[in-house]
């Protein structure tokens, strides 16, 4: 397993490096056969108004799957402890899902409820968008089923996940609904 530790607004000392290495290796030790690479990003916010100044983010690459967790606190070592525990839980869930898949599949209709979408989602409000693009990301988007995209959404610890639907070969977005459950956004031809 390859471990990369980086710091933003912080010098990664030997003591910090050793602590991160110990915690991350302990978190992923039962999943060595799945894990190929682990990226750790440590950062300190210089803004006095931010309460959780020390942030630790761990990204694990496991058999083509990305598993991500981040935690913040007032203490860097506490953030490292929290994120190590969180990534260990996520890896355990990932391994259990792999084992469950070997014993039977779940249908898409059981995961995502099919509901009609309102035509005007924002009503009379004006969309609040940033005036300029701050950052662009590029990543491979292999075709996958909605079930696999849902699994990825849960593993990356975001509110949404964009993917290429293997059934339609179109870009879809699966997201966490505010009132619970998940939703899928699919392109629709304008008539």
UniProtKB/Swiss-Prot annotation:
This is Ribosome hibernation promotion factor. It is found in: Cytoplasm. Interacts with 100S ribosomes. InterPro entries: HPF/YfiA_ribosome-assoc, HPF_long/plastid, RHF-like, RHF/RaiA, Ribosom_S30AE_C, Ribosom_S30AE_C_sf. Keywords: Cytoplasm, Translation regulation. Required for dimerization of active 70S ribosomes into 100S ribosomes in stationary phase; 100S ribosomes are translationally inactive and sometimes present during exponential growth. One of its GO terms (molecular function) is ribosomal small subunit binding. GO terms for biological process: negative regulation of translational elongation. GO terms for cellular component: cytosolic small ribosomal subunit. Belongs to the HPF/YfiA ribosome-associated protein family. Long HPF subfamily. It comes from Synechocystis sp. (strain ATCC 27184 / PCC 6803 / Kazusa). Coiled coil: none annotated. HAMAP family: HPF.
């Amino acid at each position: 397993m390859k471990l990369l530790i980086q710091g933003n607004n912080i010098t990664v000392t030997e003591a910090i490096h050793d602590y991160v290495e110990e915690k991350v290796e302990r978190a992923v030790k039962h999943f060595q056969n799945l894990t190929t690479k682990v990226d750790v990003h440590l950062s300190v916010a210089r803004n006095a108004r931010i309460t959780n100044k020390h942030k630790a983010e761990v990204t694990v690459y496991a058999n083509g799957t990305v598993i991500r967790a981040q935690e913040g606190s007032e203490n860097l070592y506490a953030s490292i402890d929290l994120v190590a525990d969180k990534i260990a839980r996520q890896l355990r869930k990932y391994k259990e899902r792999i084992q469950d898949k070997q014993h039977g599949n779940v249908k898409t209709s059981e995961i995502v409820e099919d509901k009609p979408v309102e035509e005007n989602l924002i009503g009379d409000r004006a969309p609040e968008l940033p005036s300029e693009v701050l950052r662009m990301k590029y990543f491979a988007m292999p075709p996958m089923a909605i079930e696999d995209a849902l699994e990825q959404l849960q593993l990356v610890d975001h509110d949404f996940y964009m993917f290429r639907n293997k059934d339609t070969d179109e870009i879809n977005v699966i997201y966490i609904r505010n009132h619970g459950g998940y939703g899928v956004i699919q392109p629709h031809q304008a008539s």
